[in-house]
Amino acid sequence: MMDAVRARIRDVPDFPKKGIVFKDITPVLSDPHTFREVIDAFVERWKGERVDKVIGIESRGFIFAAPIAYALGAGFTIVRKPGKLPWETIREVYALEYGEGALELHIDAIGPGDRVLVVDDVLATGGTAGAAGRLVVRQGAELLGYAFLAELSFLNGARQLGHAKVHSLLTF
């Protein structure tokens, strides 16, 4: 089922820097049939669960999270890099290869009792997704799990996400 999707993801060597092979998902997005197949596959996986909120991780997570939320009848919210959200936020810091990064969430975006799905395009090391998941838990919400278009399994990112459900449509 995902063969057409996999075929549309292209490898771009040495981007954004030498030695990295970037997974370019834009051909998946530009083809309406392939994009629909991806959204439908996400929805099929999560439709049996009561999902109250779907969080999209900046920025490509937004692309998938919004239509998933719509199809599931859930609210959509976003986590962004510091200083990008206009209202009061909470922040979660995570480790990078050299230094640290951070994500922020509006304090009123999710609350106690909400059942939350975190969505991003690619699971690599798990740092960003893990930070988003910790924001969910800090707000007293239930982290249902994570959904990714693709997982770079050789980076072992799923191990960084604890016992939460991890659903990746494709694995590389």
Curated annotation (Swiss-Prot):
Subcellular location: Cytoplasm
Catalyzed chemical reaction(s): AMP + diphosphate = 5-phospho-alpha-D-ribose 1-diphosphate + adenine
Keyword terms, alphabetized: Cytoplasm, Glycosyltransferase, Purine salvage, Transferase
EC number: 2.4.2.7
Major localisation: cytoplasm
Function: Catalyzes a salvage reaction resulting in the formation of AMP, that is energically less costly than de novo synthesis.
NCBIfam families listed in its UniProt record: apt, PRK02304.1-3, PRK02304.1-5
Protein name: Adenine phosphoribosyltransferase
